[in-house]
Amino acid sequence: MAEPTTMATTLVELLGHRVAAEPDAPYFHVYDETVTYGALWRESARYAAGLRRAGIDQGDKVCLVYPTCKEFFFTFLGLLRMGAVPVPIYPTLGVEATANVFRDSEAKAVATIGWFRKGVEESQAGASNLRHVLEPQDLEVDDAAPAFPAVTEDDVAFIQYTSGSTGLPRGVVLSHANVTRTVAFMAEAAQLTRDDVVVSWLPLYHDMGLIGCAFTPPSIGAPLWLLPPDLKNPRVWLELVTKVRATFTVSPDFGYRNCVRNIGDTSGIELSSLKQALSGAEPVRLSTIQAFEEKFSAENLITPCYGLAEATLAVAIWPRKTPLRLDSSGRFLSVGPPCRGVSVKITTEAGEAPAGTEGEISVRSPGVMQGYYRNPAATREVLGADGWLRTGDLGFLDREGFLFITGRVKDLIILAGENLVPADVEEIVDHIPGVRYSAAVGIESERTGSQRLHVVAEVREGAEDAERLSHLVREIVQRVHRGRGHRPARVLLVTPGTIPKTSSGKIQRSRLGAMITGDELGERIVYASGGHRD
């Protein structure tokens, strides 16, 4: 048995240890191809030579605009070994937003594939600092591998641009120590061993997919099976879990919800091998967990977790195969105790809050970021000199130190002095037949200055009958009023895909509010609580 690499201080060392111990062992499987640790090491050296030929040197930033593919790993590790800095980007972020990341990161080059080249070049026009657009054929050279500098734990490993749920993405600077220490305590909290088999469809440009699924398995020698994140049919995910006898997988809540809604025939799906299915990156719903476990005959399978990019992902993970814990109101699930080495406190305007009191969650851990790249003002807003990170999330700790997430500070809707959590409204609306997905936002009235509740609901394709849509609007208003005591001031029924989301599936509520007030929804509205849009 190869030794674990959890004591590695850099990602280069972590993977290098695995290469030395078992070069022929599979690191990951993707698109019916297996990449071993030895192959990764050889190809990353080759890609490093291609990057050096293009003028990339130690400290340079290179944006990675890739789908889930082996070339992503070859480029990423090649850059790490050179002492250069990878900057993974959401491939379909949009021309202006991508150009903003190109400029903000001071990237010297972009590594991509032909599928995305046109969009990359459109964004390149808005970033004069960008000198090269490189594809695999530009990097797969026969030059001798360059001399690799010594990489230390304090060096920048990569820059992870945040999802941007409340504004433009910011570059989270993570050191090698941030990543390797987080990977170590994540593997421990999730009780992962080399006997586990991991399946992931999460994107590699997001922290949950990259750090949680791509870097954690090699720390303990577990094989990884990858799927593309744009799965049209969720059955493909569960069929792969069944086929390879996976023991561990992870998804935001909407992924499990998608399986419940869109997999009719469950024959051929057998999840008994799964020891744990983590749920995170968005509010975890007990109703989703119960529906999934009932439909697929699983018990104590889905476990909540909590983290954020600014903390190198992991903060708390619920123990596997342990009954879930609800708060006394029955509304909120615990995401577990903080991981080893992670401290959590709850603060209000009065200071640190006692057990059971809701406030803003702050975190201190070896994973807390170095700061936002080239943005000291934004860094000071969230990161204190004492190392405490303000997360912007709301929650509380119970008397045993278990963490509960209740919402997000900036998302709270204040109606007649009462705080309303958007996720509470969305859970009610999402269970109404005919609704595909929903979002609740508070929009300030120009006349009174007070917030008014707006509900936007995506309706299933083919739902175009005005009478049925009118009935659906009334049903939404009645159920929200019955469940939360407030009537929506306006309900907008829209076409599928209208509600803006981040790369990890979080609702961009501030963006949605701007779309409503700026009258940007236009023809995507199929019915509104003021009348029908033809």
Labelled PLM ranges:
Residues 5-7, 24-77, 94-99, 150, ...:
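Conserved AMP-binding/adenylate-forming core of the ANL superfamily
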Residues 110, 249, 365, 370-371, ...:
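AMP-binding/adenylate-forming catalytic core of the ANL superfamily
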Residues 238, 246-251, 260-330, 343, ...:
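Gly/Ser/Thr-rich phosphate-binding loop
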Residues 413, 439-444, 454-455, 477-533:
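Conserved C-terminal "lid"/linker of ANL adenylate-forming enzymes
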Residues 180-197, 207-247, 262-266:
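Conserved AMP-binding/adenylation subdomain of ANL enzymes
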Residues 23, 143-161, 167-168, 178, ...:
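Conserved pre-ATP/AMP-binding loop-to-beta segment of ANL
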Residues 327-332, 368-392, 409-410, 426:
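Conserved ANL (AMP-binding/adenylate-forming) active-site segment centered on the GW(Y/F)…HTG consensus within
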Residues 53-54, 81-149, 252-253, 258, ...:
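Structural core segment of the AMP-binding/adenylate-forming
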